[in-house]
């Protein structure tokens, strides 16, 4: 059975890739250049795909940045720091991004005659990202089933899980988290201050494991959250 995984190069989608491959699917991946300020995540996505020996398609839709302004796409907008629950984090929402990604990924899945399409929405994204919520996932499932003669089933198996739960799954699967990138900034090291860094650091702290990537700031990995 064939499956396509939408792969950003971050923790969640990388864990999902390992998970899907471990289930025995003939696995393909798709990533997107959507005009984001940096594409460092995709560099790591490529490395992971090479490691796992899975095909990796990168689709350039850079024009999307002009249609969907966000702190992740506009050089004049600063990336906010703090927690996802902070109101300022709404600046990082790229309008309708996942609907666009999933629509294109569905076309790719159909071309491959794949039966499944996976993406890594999870519970930690719900407060700020509308297109990661369970209601959105269910609506997209129905739409994808109606869009073509070939049946492609959308799966978001982590939609009710917290990031630390996904991390536990990944560690059991042997995910190499040094080959993942979460930071909204594209520096040599992760900033440790933006929303995704904050959430990532908390996940590792909660399960008592040190993150293998480097940060610009010193992190107390023994601190409990």
UniProtKB/Swiss-Prot annotation:
One BP term from GO: queuosine biosynthetic process
Molecular functions per Gene Ontology: ATP binding; ligase activity, forming carbon-nitrogen bonds; zinc ion binding
Domain of life: Bacteria
EC code: 6.3.4.20
Keywords associated with the record: ATP-binding, Ligase, Metal-binding, Nucleotide-binding, Queuosine biosynthesis, Zinc
Listed cofactors: Zn(2+)
Entry's cofactor comment: Binds 1 zinc ion per subunit.
Catalytic activity: 7-carboxy-7-deazaguanine + NH4(+) + ATP = 7-cyano-7-deazaguanine + ADP + phosphate + H2O + H(+)
Residues that bind ATP: 7-17
Pathway: Purine metabolism; 7-cyano-7-deazaguanine biosynthesis
Pfam family, any one: QueC
Record's subunit section: Homodimer.
Family note: Belongs to the QueC family.
Role this protein plays: Catalyzes the ATP-dependent conversion of 7-carboxy-7-deazaguanine (CDG) to 7-cyano-7-deazaguanine (preQ(0)).
PANTHER family: 7-CYANO-7-DEAZAGUANINE SYNTHASE
Protein name: 7-cyano-7-deazaguanine synthase
Species: Caldicellulosiruptor saccharolyticus (strain ATCC 43494 / DSM 8903 / Tp8T 6331)
